[in-house]
UniProtKB/Swiss-Prot annotation:
GO biological process assignments: DNA recombination; regulation of DNA recombination
Location within or outside the cell: Cytoplasm, Nucleoid
InterPro entries: RdgC
Matching Pfam families: RdgC
Protein known as: Recombination-associated protein RdgC
Main location: cytoplasm
Assigned keywords, A-Z: Cytoplasm, DNA recombination
Protein function: May be involved in recombination.
Source taxonomy: Bacteria, Pseudomonadati, Pseudomonadota, Betaproteobacteria, Burkholderiales
Length: 306
């Protein structure tokens, strides 16, 4: 249930969108299996396998982005194309040109696609309409871009904005690493990455290792800055913070696992309980994280204008 990665975006808070309205927006872009000659197909699928494209409880929505892609290695295409080009050269008596080779490659791709295996990847999207968060559970930026692209295509207009904090995450992480502590109920854990801003980009990584203050100071004095830092929020959730404010390796700790509703009678009730618990905890953590990074600049601009 728990998201492993958090790609953060802002929506208006509150965002007056109902589950029914969201369902209508997504329906024209529902996932359909690709044809035998399509390399990739994307669309919205049911998060609960019940036909509904939107799962919603307590103003929290869950969407599911599905991508189907054919597995056709470039090495296979190139190998078959090369063999086909040799045959053509023997027939026509001269070397295949660039344009002809490109056409052969396209022909080979079309022939091999129907026999290629397909893989599906599902990516979850959490929308907090009460507090104005849209969060994509994706580690890779390219995947998050694909999800955002379909969101924009499905919801017009989509009032989506990035999260721009007042303080640079790199500067903040470097200071926390140097002092060995972070503010606001956050603690520094034992994983960190320090990278030099020089052209060479020398990098030092610590994994499961005590982050000694003297070692950190020595690296920072030579021009390195912290670009990844493992942290824990209120002894409840551990995660890794990155320069882009993407949050990775999100893990609920024992105190949250023990808070799961023991009275849930079936899978639906357990899902409701788990999703409510996850969104509540992550929502509070995100608010605290933005606060210790100086607040959201977008909110500050609006307050100043008012």
């Amino acid at each position: 249930m728990w998201f492993k990665n958090l790609q953060l975006h802002h929506l208006p808070a509150p965002w007056a969108v109902t589950p029914d309205q969201m369902e209508k927006w997504l329906a024209p872009h529902a996932f359909q299996p690709g044809s035998s000659v399509e390399m990739q197909r994307v669309g919205w699928a049911s998060p609960r396998d019940d036909g509904a494209l939107v799962y919603s409880i307590n103003r929290q929505m869950l969407l599911l982005f599905r991508a189907e892609k054919k597995l056709l290695p470039a090495s296979v295409v190139n190998q078959v194309t090369k063999a086909r080009a040799l045959e053509v050269e023997e027939q026509q008596g001269f070397k295949v040109g660039r344009k002809q080779l490109r056409e052969l490659k396209e022909q080979v791709t079309d022939e091999l696609l129907p026999r290629a295996f397909s893989i599906r990847r599902d990516t979850r999207v959490w929308i907090d309409t009460a507090n104005g968060w849209l969060v994509i559970d994706a580690a890779a930026q390219a995947l998050a871009d694909d999800v955002r692209s379909l969101l924009v295509k499905s919801i017009d207009p989509l009032p989506l904005a990035g999260v721009h904090v007042a303080r640079s995450p790199v500067a903040a992480m470097t200071d926390w690493l140097l002092s060995g502590e972070a503010p606001g109920g956050f603690t520094v854990d034992q994983d960190a990455e320090l990278r030099s801003s020089d052209q060479g980009g020398a990098t030092v990584r610590y994994v499961g290792h005590a982050l000694e203050a003297n070692d950190m100071r020595r690296h920072i004095e030579t021009g390195k800055q912290c670009t990844r830092l493992a942290m824990t929020w209120n002894d409840r959730i551990s995660f890794v913070l990155t320069p882009s404010l993407t949050i990775k390796r999100v893990t609920p700790l024992d105190v949250i696992k023990e808070a799961a509703d023991p009275t849930a009678q079936n899978d639906d009730e357990r899902f409701d309980s788990d999703f409510t618990l996850m969104t509540g905890e992550l929502g509070r953590m995100l608010t605290d994280l933005v606060d210790i990074l100086g607040g959201d600049r977008h909110d500050s601009i609006h307050q100043a204008a008012a």
